A protein has these predicted regions:
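Extended repeat-based interaction scaffolds and adjacent low-complexity, acidic/S/T/P-biased segments
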Residues: 177, 184-214
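Short, small-residue-biased leader/transition segments that mark boundaries at the very start
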Residues: 1-3
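Aromatic- and Lys/Arg-enriched surface recognition patch
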Residues: 77-186
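Short N-terminal edge-element motif at the start of the domain
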Residues: 9-79
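Glutamate identity and glutamate-enriched acidic tracts
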Residues: 17, 51, 89-93, 193, ...
Length: 214
């Protein structure tokens, strides 16, 4: 992790405020997804990649990336929030494909086999429309108010009808905790690949579009 000043905030101090006391200036982060370069890239491997592949994730599908965010001035406030997106243009499978692509486009990525060997190594390459949400918006917050951060609440406009009909929204591990309040508990063991079926429920695509076009 490269710890530098950002917008007047010292990186080392910010990490200490969120209890990341074991991080030093000599540590490096696994920068993935990489959404700041000319081509967006997202690496997966092992069982996580198998889960995506087995559920039919492919060309044209959209990743919405979420993370854990804290307000450093008040550590008691923490949320899950969407921070970026990537629509799949190409899927690179295996070390040879990945290495050749990165070399051709003069890109660096932690899934480059010269850095580390991964089982089932895969990189998802973006279409031109990808990026980071650089401004805070309540629309990007997943955590439900007055709940732990892992309890998500989805917007009524896009999810209420499908939840009421008990449509098959979730393709893998998620399920409704309370379909009337549109609550889903994501604290269900290891893994963070949550796959939604936008073919079954087209309103999911409209929700994603409302975020990425904001």
């Amino acid at each position: 992790m490269c710890i530098r000043d950002s917008n007047g905030i010292n990186g080392t101090q910010a990490l200490k405020e969120v209890s990341a006391t074991k991080v030093s200036s000599k540590d490096f982060c696994h920068y993935d997804p990489a959404l700041n370069d000319k081509i967006g890239l997202f690496g997966q491997a092992g069982s996580a990649q198998s889960e995506l592949k087995n559920n039919g994730v492919g060309i044209g599908d959209l990743f919405l990336f979420f993370g854990w965010f804290k307000k450093t001035e008040n550590p008691k406030i923490d949320i899950h929030k969407i921070f970026g997106w990537l629509q799949i243009e190409e899927i690179l499978e295996g070390d040879k494909q990945i290495a050749n692509f990165l070399k051709k486009h003069k890109l660096s990525h932690p899934h480059d086999p010269k850095y580390r060997k991964y089982k089932n190594n895969t990189i998802y390459v973006s279409r031109k429309n990808f990026g980071l949400f650089k401004k805070f918006s309540k629309k990007l917050v997943l955590s439900a108010p007055n709940h732990k951060k892992s309890m998500w609440q989805f917007p009524k406009k896009y999810f209420a009808s499908a939840a009421k009909k008990k449509s098959n929204i979730f393709l893998n591990r998620l399920k409704w905790k309370d379909n009337r309040k549109l609550l889903v508990d994501t604290n269900i063991g290891p893994g963070q690949e949550f796959i939604f079926d936008a073919q079954e429920v087209p309103d999911i695509s409209l929700w994603a579009k409302s975020l990425t076009e904001e």
